[in-house]
Amino acid sequence: ALTRLNEEGRGEDYSNIGVNVISLTDQDLQELYQFMGDLDALSIRYASRHPDQEGLRKRLEENIALTAVVEEKDTLTGQETSCWIKASDHFHLMFYDYADNSRLTEAADRLRGQLTIFSNAYEREDRPQREIFREHKKIWEAYRQKDYSAAASLMKEHLNRSLLYAKELSQKML
């Protein structure tokens, strides 16, 4: 675990002393979410060239149907929330699966660990869940209509809005 913190840039290793966990500043969050938005948008562009578009569209549609539970209930149970977060995260990962670019996926994986600390916390709240679902649905609609440029732009906007939740959470943690 300590080695992973180090690899993800969330820790500093001191020989014979241990690892010091680094806290993220607002500037760090800004850079992380902006870059992640760029990577996610790029994964959409790469995925749009994959020969099995029907397979990707089907998986995205199933994901949207699964996460739509936030529109149907006032509040999710703890177990439903955990399942929803996993499915919500998977929405992003499906584009990487179809991007067929291991270096893009590896770069995103390295950053994702740093963002997960925040997203797993704010995605437990009702308002962010609903807004994230609506944003995913818009991305899906653009992708389904083969407007890949719009889908990529919407993904970047989605990460920018997620940044606001992360900053709010960061302020609460101080």
For every predicted segment, state its role.
Residues 18-21, 101, 129:
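Generic secondary-structure boundary/loop-capping signal
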Residues 160-170:
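Short arginine-rich
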Residues 27, 53-120, 132-142, 150-161:
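Conserved amphipathic alpha-helical segments that form helical-bundle/coiled-coil interaction surfaces
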Residues 124-128:
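Solvent-exposed loop and edge beta-strand segments that line ligand/cofactor-binding
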Residues 37-38, 45-48, 109-110, 121-122, ...:
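Glycine-rich loops and low-complexity Gly/Arg-rich segments
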Residues 1-49, 168-174:
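Short linear motifs at protein or domain termini
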Residues 41, 119, 130, 164-165:
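A generic membrane alpha-helix/interface feature
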